[in-house]
Every structure is written in structure tokens, then in C-alpha cells.
């Protein structure tokens, strides 16, 4: 019987390669997938999370990190007056979205454009973990 060692495949998954699996685990929260988000590959070491936060002003959004956990919260300062809707398709509720980040990830910044909150991420692999060429003498 032949055994396959998959460890070399996991060794190449430093940082962001594992990020997608970790982000999916954050999707299993009780918020029912609200607000929706995308994860975009910008280049080899840069990623962007886009979160749909229509209806929230910049001062109503909070982004924090603790250990390897990115937390995005949205809360309306003034609750809207009681309204009678014929149809309500736009969610106006407060939210908290958590993302488990992989190792060696730095949050570069965030900006709010047209109802989308963009969070830019960068993979910074320490020199000690990067491949290096050994000279043969």
C-alpha cells in the first residue's frame, strides 16, 4: 500500500493561501451572511476584502484587529423611526462580521466608496521563511 504525504502542499500555504479557508469559516456566523463580502486577489501578495455596507456612514463603521481576528462592526447611531413598509428588501440592521486572518498578514488600510467598505491586506513573509538560494562551492 502506498502512502501519500500531503505535508509539502501545506508548507507552501504560508499566509493568504490559508486565508480563504479561514474566511469561509467566518461565514458560518449567526448573522446569516449579512453583510455580503468579496475577497479579491490584487496581486501575488495583496488582497482586498470588499464588504457591502450601503446605508452606513463612515463614522458608523468600526474596524478592529485582535491577534489574528479582523472584526468589522456597523451600528446606526440613530435608530430610524418606526416605518410601515409595503416591501422591505434593504437591510438596515447593525452587524458584526469577523474574519480569521492567517499568519503574516498586515492590514494596510480601509476606505469607504459608494457603499462598499474596502479593506486592503498584504502578506509580509519574514525573511527567515522566504526561500533562499544556496551557493554550491
Swiss-Prot record:
InterPro entries: A-crystallin/Hsp20_dom, ACD_IbpA/B, HSP20-like_chaperone, HSP20_IbpA. The keyword Cell cycle does not apply. Associates with aggregated proteins, together with IbpB, to stabilize and protect them from irreversible denaturation and extensive proteolysis during heat shock and oxidative stress. Aggregated proteins bound to the IbpAB complex are more efficiently refolded and reactivated by the ATP-dependent chaperone systems ClpB and DnaK/DnaJ/GrpE. Its activity is ATP-independent. Its main location: cytoplasm. GO terms for cellular component: cytoplasm. Signal peptide: none annotated. Residues 28-137 form the sHSP domain. Keywords: Chaperone, Cytoplasm, Stress response. GO terms for biological process: protein stabilization. Gene3D superfamilies: 2.60.40.790. It comes from the Bacteria. This is Small heat shock protein IbpA. The keyword Chaperone applies. It is found in: Cytoplasm. Monomer. Forms homomultimers of about 100-150 subunits at optimal growth temperatures. Conformation changes to monomers at high temperatures or high ionic concentrations.
